[in-house]
C-alpha cells in the first residue's frame, strides 16, 4: 500500500511539473537573432506547439472576420499577415529537423501535423468572410498604397485567388478534398522512399569482391553489414542519390552493376516497394487542380509565380542547355569509353555503372592524381570555409563569424553570424546560418 501511494504521488508530481513547464517553441527566444533554443526543446514539444499555434491562428482569423470596423490594411491585411507568425515559426524549426535528422519519433509527429496544416490552409483559403475583407481593401487601396504595403496587399489577394477563393462552391469543396488527398499521398510517398533507401543494401560475401576500395571504406562496409543483421560479411549501403560514390573505386564490374541497379530500382517495384501508383495519382490530382483554376496543365499553374513564368520558357532554357552541353558530354563519354577499351577490349561498351570508375582511372593516368589523394583537401570545414564562405564573400560581399553560444539539435552542427558589406557598419549583421 505504501509503495502504491508513493508511486501515485510521484506520478502526480511529474504531471504537475510537466504542466508547469512552458513549451520553449511557444516562448520568445532569449538567444541572438531569436534562434530556437535546442538545449530546451524536446521532441515531445513539437505536436503541442503546432496544436497551440494553429489554434492561435484560428482565433486571430476569427477576430479579423468579426471586427465590426470597415476593412483596412492594418486591421485586415497586416492582421492576417501577423496571424500565422507562430505557425510559421514552429514549422520552420520542425521542418528543418525533418529534412536533416528524421527519427521515427519525428516521422510520427510529421504524419500527425501535415493533415492539420493542410486543414488549416483549407479553412483560411476558403474563408469567404475573410476573403471579402481582403478584396475590399484590394479593390479600394491597391493603386494608392506604396512600396511594401502595396506588395503585401497584392500578394495576399492574389494568393487567395490562386488557391480558389473565386471558384464556385462545388469546385471549392473539390479543391479542399484534392489538397487533403495530395498531402496524404505525399506523406505515403516520402515514407516509402525513406524505407526503400534505408533498406537498399547490396550484400557482399567476400573482401576480395571489394577490391579497389580503400581500407577505410572496406571497414565501413563491414560495420554496415553488422548493423544490418550480418546476412553477409560486408554490405554496401545505398545513399540518397542515383550515382553511388563507391562506383568510382570498385574493380568488380558485376558488383558495380548491382550497386547501380539497387540505387535506381529502390522504389520502382523491382523490389518490395513501388511508389508508381502514388506518383501517378499525385500527378492526376495536380492536373485536376490546374484545370479547376483554368490552367492548361499543372506546370503552367505552378510556374506562374516563379522566375520562369511559363512551361515554354522552361523548355526553351532546357533546349539551350542541351544544345551546349550534349556535344561536350558525348565527347567526354567517348573519351572515357576509348580509355576503357585500352584494357577491356575493343568491344567494351560503357554502361552507367562504369562511368565513374573509368573516369577516375583516366583522371589518375592523365593527371597523376586520385580521388583518395585529394580527399584530405575536402574536409567539411575546408569545403565550408574555403569553398562556400569564400565564394559567398567574393560574389555577394558576405562574411561569416561562428557563434558557439547558440545551441543546435546536433553536435556536428555549427552556427554562424552572417554580415553583408553592402550595408553600413551598424547594420551589417543580416542573420544567422546553421550548417
Where are the regions a protein language model picked out?
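Short His/Asp/Glu-rich catalytic/ion-coordination signatures at enzyme active sites or charged loops
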Residues: 30-45, 94-113, 135-177, 237-277, ...
Amino acid at each position: 500500500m505504501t509503495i502504491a501511494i508513493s508511486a501515485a504521488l510521484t506520478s502526480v508530481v511529474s504531471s504537475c511539473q510537466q504542466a508547469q513547464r512552458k513549451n520553449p517553441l511557444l516562448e520568445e527566444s532569449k538567444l541572438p537573432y531569436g534562434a530556437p533554443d535546442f538545449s530546451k526543446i524536446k521532441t515531445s514539444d513539437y505536436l503541442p506547439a503546432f496544436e497551440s499555434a494553429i489554434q492561435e491562428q484560428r482565433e486571430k482569423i476569427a477576430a479579423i472576420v468579426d471586427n465590426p470596423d470597415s476593412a483596412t490594411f492594418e486591421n485586415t491585411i497586416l492582421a492576417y499577415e501577423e496571424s500565422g507568425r507562430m505557425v510559421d515559426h514552429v514549422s520552420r524549426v520542425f521542418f528543418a529537423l525533418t529534412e536533416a535528422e528524421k527519427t521515427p519519433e519525428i516521422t510520427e509527429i510529421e504524419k500527425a501535423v501535415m493533415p492539420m496544416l493542410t486543414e488549416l490552409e483549407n479553412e483560411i483559403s476558403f474563408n469567404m468572410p475573410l476573403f471579402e475583407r481582403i478584396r475590399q481593401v484590394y479593390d479600394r487601396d491597391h493603386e494608392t498604397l506604396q512600396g511594401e504595403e502595396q506588395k503585401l496587399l497584392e500578394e495576399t489577394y492574389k494568393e487567395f485567388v490562386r488557391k480558389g477563393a473565386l471558384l464556385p462552391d462545388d469546385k471549392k469543396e473539390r479543391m479542399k478534398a484534392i489538397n487533403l488527398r495530395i498531402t496524404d499521398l505525399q506523406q505515403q510517398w516520402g515514407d516509402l522512399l525513406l524505407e526503400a533507401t534505408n533498406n537498399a543494401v547490396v550484400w557482399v560475401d567476400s573482401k576480395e569482391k571489394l577490391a579497389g576500395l580503400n581500407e577505410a571504406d572496406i571497414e565501413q562496409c563491414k560495420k554496415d553489414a553488422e548493423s544490418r543483421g550480418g546476412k553477409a560479411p560486408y554490405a554496401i549501403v545505398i545513399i540518397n542519390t542515383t550515382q553511388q560514390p563507391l562506383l568510382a573505386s570498385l574493380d568488380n564490374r558485376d558488383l558495380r552493376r548491382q550497386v547501380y541497379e539497387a540505387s535506381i530500382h529502390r522504389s520502382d517495384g523491382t523490389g518490395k516497394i513501388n511508389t508508381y501508383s502514388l506518383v501517378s495519382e499525385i500527378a492526376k490530382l495536380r492536373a485536376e487542380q490546374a484545370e479547376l483554376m483554368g490552367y492548361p496543365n499543372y506546370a503552367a499553374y505552378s510556374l506562374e509565380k516563379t522566375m520562369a513564368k511559363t512551361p515554354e520558357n522552361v523548355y526553351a532554357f532546357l533546349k539551350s542547355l542541351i544544345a551546349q552541353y550534349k556535344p561536350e558530354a558525348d565527347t567526354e563519354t567517348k573519351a572515357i569509353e576509348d580509355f576503357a577499351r585500352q584494357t577491356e577490349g575493343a568491344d567494351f561498351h560503357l554502361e552507367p555503372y562504369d562511368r565513374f570508375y573509368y573516369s577516375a582511372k583516366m583522371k589518375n593516368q592523365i593527371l597523376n592524381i586520385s580521388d583518395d589523394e585529394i580527399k584530405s583537401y575536402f574536409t567539411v570545414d575546408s569545403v565550408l570555409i574555403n569553398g562556400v564562405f569564400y565564394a559567398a564573400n567574393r560574389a555577394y560581399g558576405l562574411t561569416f563569424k561562428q557563434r558557439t553560444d547558440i545551441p543546435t539539435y546536433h553536435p556536428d552542427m555549427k552556427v554562424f553570424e552572417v554580415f553583408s558589406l553592402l550595408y553600413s557598419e551598424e547594420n551589417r549583421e543580416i542573420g544567422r546560418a546553421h550548417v
